[in-house]
Each structure stands twice: as structure tokens, then as C-alpha cells.
Amino acid sequence: MPPQYSDAFRVANIVIGCFQNITAGGILFGWASISGSLLLATPTDGGPGLGHDYIHIMFVTASFFSFLGPLLLGAILDSYGPRVCSVTSMLFISCGCILFAVSNVPNFPMFIPALSMIAFGGPGVQSAIVHLCNLFPGKKGTATAFITGSFQLSFIIFLVFDQLWHFYKYDYQTLFMGYGVVSLCNTILSLLFWPDEPYTYEEPAAVVVSII
């Protein structure tokens, strides 16, 4: 274990990283939870009133950007470190959520660019926290499991949207605008906690004893 990092510091970092991953890492992949309900609902029912074909095109386009994101955000991670990578990713997600919230079918149909921004930023969130495994040199497998597991848990976010719309009558604008605020809070966490250089761990040098 690197002596300069306390147990509290290491645990706090992995908890924050997993929280960010759950709330931002892979939310696009839970799209099926809202594609047949919230997104189809008319404005009077709290939805944007999108058609099946439009929703299909929207998520196909967003899926493309979710695969493009790691390439470009990975380059940012290599050049500028985890802090800049995470902040950039979170800003894409936040701006995408806000843009989705202010979009509407007749006047400002920007749903495709909005969801594409959310999809683009998601993978960068996970890329920016992978280095946290180095804080746990003796338990890297466990730390990696937490990170990958939290990414998969993010699939539930749109299901939560659907339940809030169905049972509590929150409209899509309130849901996405609120989530934009959550992403802005995540941006602040990234600014405060993530380092400019990834955490590293070097194996202790082997001691060679020569017998003469």
C-alpha cells in the first residue's frame, strides 16, 4: 500500500468514483426503460411525444457516440489526466441533460444531439476512475469489480426516471433538468477530488542476495 494514502482517503476515493460511475457512467444503456413509455407520452402526459422511428434513430445515433467517446476522452485522459477527463465527461452529460430538458417537438427538437452528448460523456467517467485500483495494490481485483459493477448499476437510472414519471407524474423536463444538476454536482466532485495525474503503484524492488 502506498504509505502516503490513508485508508480513509482510499475508501473515500473509491466511494466517490463508484457514485459517479453509477450516476453517469452508462445511463444510456438503460434507455429501454423509457423508450416505450416516457418518451412516447404526449406533452399533456408529461412526455415529449416522440415517435417510435425517431426514438430508434435517436438511440442508434447516441450508441455511436458512446463508442466514439472512449477514443477521444481517452486521449484527454492521457494528455491532461483524470481530473480534466472527468470534468469534461461530466460537462457533456450535464449539458446533454439540460438540452434534452429544454427540447420540444414543435419548436426545438434537439433530442438527438442531447442524448448523443449524454452518451459521449458516459464512458469517460469510467475511464477517469480506473486508476483508483492502484490505491488498493493488494485488492485490485476487488476494486476493479466495484468499478465495473457500478457502471452496470447505472443502467437503472432511466428506470428510476420511468418510475418517477409513472407514479409521481414528473415530466421529462423536470427529470432531465434535475439530472443535469446532479451531473453538475458530480463535476464539482471531480474538480475537488480527482488528481491531475493517475495514481500509480510500483512493486517493491526485489532484494537480491548474492552468496560469495
Question: What positions do the PLM features span?
Answer:
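Long, low-complexity inter-transmembrane loops of multi-pass membrane transporters
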Residues: 194-212
